[in-house]
Amino acid sequence: MERVRGIGGLFFKAKDPERLRAFYRDLLGVPIEEWGGARFGWREHDARGDACTVWNPFSADTTYFRPSEAAFMVNFRVDDLDAMLAQLRAAGAPVDDRIEDGEYGRFGWVMDPEGNRVELWQPPH
C-alpha cells in the first residue's frame, strides 16, 4: 500500500502576503526566496532527538490557538526560545507572556500581522 511520507508544504491565504512575508523574514528569520515562499531542508542530523514533523487535527472548539480565530497554527522549531522571544519583543511583535516547559521542550507564541498564532518550539536538549 502506498502511504504519505511526510508534509510536503504548508499553503495558506493572506490578506497582505508581502507584509506577512516581511514579518516572517525579518522577525523570525524565515528564508523567503524570490518566488515568495521558503523551503526548509529536513535532515535527521539536524535533530537533537527524534526527527519528525507533527500532524494533529484539533477539535473545532479548541482554545489552544487563541486569541487567533484561524483554523490552523504553524509551529516553528527554534534553537533558543528566550533569544527568539526577546528579538520579537524588541521589534514590537505581540508576544504571549506565557512560556510552557515540559517533556517535549519549551513553547512560546507570537501573533503574526494577520492575527495567526505562531508557536515557537525549542526541543529538549
Label the model's feature ranges.
Residues 1, 48, 65-67, 101:
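Sterically constrained small-residue positions within well-ordered secondary structures
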Residues 29-31, 76-77, 98-99:
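Short linear motifs in intrinsically disordered
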Residues 2-5, 11-55, 90:
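Core segments of cupin and vicinal oxygen chelate
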Residues 1-15, 33-35, 43, 61-125, ...:
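Vicinal oxygen chelate
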Residues 55-60, 93:
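Short amphipathic beta-strand starts and helix->beta connectors
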Residues 42-44, 59, 122:
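Pocket-edge structural micro-motifs
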